[in-house]
């Protein structure tokens, strides 16, 4: 049977991969967004694992809310990137600093 330790190990591994994605790739904004989504997925796995371990549904309900917010964040972030790419022709992190606003 798969225990709580296995889920926590998988979640910790995903979180570390997301952290490495943030720190090692500073050029591409899409990879940064994907790394943040990977970290949120690791948090959701932790919430569901502890919720199942404790026999409480609050963690699973909270995970649904986190997934909803993460989907909205990804959609808005990608929409901003598409508009930025149309205006500037690039999505490098260094060029995002020159945005007006």
From Swiss-Prot:
GO terms for molecular function: NADH:ubiquinone reductase (non-electrogenic) activity; quinone binding. The keyword Transmembrane applies. Keywords: Cell inner membrane, Cell membrane, Membrane, NAD, Quinone, Translocase, Transmembrane, Transmembrane helix, Transport, Ubiquinone. Pfam families: Oxidored_q2. NDH-1 is composed of 14 different subunits. Subunits NuoA, H, J, K, L, M, N constitute the membrane sector of the complex. NDH-1 shuttles electrons from NADH, via FMN and iron-sulfur (Fe-S) centers, to quinones in the respiratory chain. The immediate electron acceptor for the enzyme in this species is believed to be ubiquinone. Couples the redox reaction to proton translocation (for every two electrons transferred, four hydrogen ions are translocated across the cytoplasmic membrane), and thus conserves the redox energy in a proton gradient. This is NADH-quinone oxidoreductase subunit K. It comes from Ruegeria pomeroyi (strain ATCC 700808 / DSM 15171 / DSS-3).
């Amino acid at each position: 049977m798969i225990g709580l330790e296995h889920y926590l190990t998988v979640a910790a591994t995903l979180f570390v991969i997301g952290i490495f994605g943030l720190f090692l790739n500073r050029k591409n904004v899409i990879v940064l967004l994907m790394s943040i989504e990977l970290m949120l997925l690791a948090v959701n796995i932790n919430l569901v694992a502890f919720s199942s371990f404790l026999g409480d549904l609050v963690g699973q309900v909270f995970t649904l809310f986190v997934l909803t917010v993460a989907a909205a964040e990804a959609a808005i972030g990608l929409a901003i990137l598409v508009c930025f790419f149309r205006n500037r022709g690039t999505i490098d992190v260094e060029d995002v600093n020159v945005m007006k606003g």
